């Protein structure tokens, strides 16, 4: 079974004043298996952001399914959506969204603290990720003390 499966995804926006319909996504289908990496590329206005917003449960499709571990996330409640985002998604923004008054370790721990994880679990989760991303040596530094590439890796670890 695929980790993520997108079936016949369609998104149509209706303009506010003229009521014109703009089709942002048409019959999008793909699957992602565990361990695979996916890049979404396309021209400006091709629907990349719309697709990502639907995958992140920030927007609903007009029709179609988004299956994560076999569960259709397009039909879950607002409370379930918040839990889904916290437990299954990670966002890496272009500006990194790191807090300069927190060291890198605390920036990584922040979403775990908000999820009420205990310190031993946070430390256990951080160790292999920091090693894999090559950031063990910068965990006690602050974001303003590291390079852009290192900031990106800290954001990925978070």
Indicate residue ranges for each PLM-predicted region:
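ABC family nucleotide-binding domain
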Residues: 2-158
């Amino acid at each position: 079974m695929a980790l993520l499966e997108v079936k016949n995804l369609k998104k149509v926006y209706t303009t506010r004043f003229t009521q014109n319909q703009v089709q942002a996504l048409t019959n999008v289908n793909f699957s992602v298996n565990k361990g695979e990496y996916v890049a979404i590329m396309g021209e400006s206005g091709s629907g990349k952001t719309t697709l990502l917003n639907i995958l992140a449960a920030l927007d609903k499709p007009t029709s179609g399914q988004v299956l994560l571990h076999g569960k259709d996330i397009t039909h879950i409640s607002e409370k379930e959506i918040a839990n889904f985002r916290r437990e299954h998604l990670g966002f890496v923004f272009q500006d990194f969204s790191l807090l300069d008054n927190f060291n890198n370790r605390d920036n990584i721990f922040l979403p775990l603290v908000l999820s009420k994880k205990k310190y031993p679990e946070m430390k256990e989760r951080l160790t292999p990720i920091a090693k894999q991303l090559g950031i063990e040596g910068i965990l006690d530094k602050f974001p303003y003390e590291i390079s852009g590439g290192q900031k990106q890796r800290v954001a990925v670890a978070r």
